[in-house]
A protein has these predicted regions:
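N-terminal Rossmann-like NAD(P)+-binding subdomain of aldehyde/semialdehyde dehydrogenases
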Residues: 1-37
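Conserved small-residue-rich beta-alpha loop and adjacent elements
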Residues: 22-86
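Short acidic loop-to-helix transition motifs that present clustered carboxylates
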Residues: 24-25, 76-80, 99-107, 248
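Conserved NAD(P)+-binding/catalytic subdomain of aldehyde/semialdehyde dehydrogenases
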Residues: 92-179
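NAD(P)-dependent aldehyde/semialdehyde dehydrogenase
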Residues: 178-293
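Internal helix-turn-beta structural module
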Residues: 280-334
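Single conserved hydrophobic/aromatic residue that forms the stacking wall/gate
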Residues: 336-345
Length: 345
């Protein structure tokens, strides 16, 4: 799993280029990509030890070149979970603490006698962790405001109800308030999926959680056309979107609001969440309208710089600056830019 996450993050990192360009003779503008200097990675382990979350946060920060990676996780059944701690260490964490909940993220953000504060917090958590990150945002950066996990299945008659039901319940079992939505243009498939959900719930070990979530937050939406399915999917902007149709690539081309797409019946959300290599820290509550999920670029800051190489360029830029300062009414800036230009004449 870590090999897959690392390989994809390394490929993504290669798409982030630094830049230097001469926009006018003697005027050089550029930007540098600098890793965040200290990151705190929170890995949940209260109800279930979320080993995959260590892969997604620690490994990705390591690929980005973060010099100091701090990882915390709550005790699992009274002890540090060995699988989680091992994943943190293998992923590249420099410091590991058994400290859970809002105490964990608070300690990383504010610091303690033994933990130096970090610059950024990443990783999922329960409602208390999410609220702690919200209140700490500003003092530190965060990856995103994550709510309960969400899933959407977009399907047509090319698949059966069993696979749709399995995908829906696979996320519904994560929590009592995890939305699971299906969009289809096949009434037959919709009815078949309802029946399969009832059947699977009877044998599912996590029946209590999954059935409550499906009862309160589950729905199947019947549409007339693929265009209507697309419109509804973009409106809902779900975290996980499983597309199983004869037009998968069309949805890939036209979907604009989502956390991550899982294309085709072979590409199930569970594997995508855990081992396939893309990051599972994704936007929820329609945040996919304006942001993507955690990726190597989240750990990279792009800083601009500028330099003027000739007196002629400095004079020209100074004249432009004087005019704009006068227009805006900033007299101090006007005097500064005017004097700078005059000194070079």
């Amino acid at each position: 799993a870590q090999k897959q996450v690392r390989s994809f993050a390394e490929a993504q990192l290669k798409t982030l280029s630094e830049l230097e360009v001469e926009t006018h003779p003697g005027v050089i503008l550029g930007h540098k990509n600098i890793p965040v200097q200290a990151v705190g990675c929170y890995v949940p382990a209260g109800k279930f030890p979320m080993v995959a979350s260590a892969h997604m946060s620690v490994v990705t920060a390591s690929v980005a070149g973060v010099p100091r990676i701090v990882a915390t996780t709550p005790p699992f059944k009274g002890k540090p979970n060995p699988a989680v701690v091992t994943a943190m260490k293998m992923g590249g964490a420099h410091e590991i603490y058994v400290l859970g909940g809002m105490q964990g993220v608070g300690a990383m953000a504010i610091g303690t006698e033994t933990i130096k504060p970090v610059d950024m917090l990443v990783g999922p958590g329960n409602a208390f962790v999410a609220e702690a990150k919200r209140q700490l945002y500003g003092k530190v950066g965060i990856d995103l405001f994550a709510g309960p996990t969400e899933t959407m299945v977009i399907a047509d008659e090319t698949v059966d109800g069993e696979i749709c039901a399995t995908d829906l319940l696979g996320q519904a079992e994560h929590g009592y308030n995890s939305p699971a939505v299906m969009i289809t243009n096949s009434r037959k498939l919709a009815e078949e999926t309802f029946k399969e959900i009832d059947r699977i719930l009877e044998i599912l070990p996590t029946k209590e959680t999954a059935s409550t979530s499906w009862r309160d937050y589950g729905e199947i939406i019947l549409c007339d056309t693929y265009e209507e399915m697309l419109s509804k999917a973009n409106e809902i902007a779900s975290e996980h979107v499983q597309v199983m149709t004869k037009k998968d690539d069309w949805f890939l081309e036209n979907m604009t609001s989502y956390g991550a797409l899982f294309l085709g019946a072979r590409t199930n959300v569970a594997n995508g969440d855990k081992v396939i290599g893309t990051n599972h820290t994704l936007p929820t509550k329609k945040a996919g309208r304006y942001t993507g999920g955690l990726w190597v670029g989240k750990f990279i800051k792009t800083h601009t710089y500028q330099k003027i190489m000739t007196d002629e360029a400095a004079t020209l830029i100074g004249e432009y600056g004087s005019r704009l300062s006068h227009l805006e009414g900033f007299i101090g800036c006007l005097l500064y830019t005017s004097d700078a230009a005059d000194d070079l004449r």
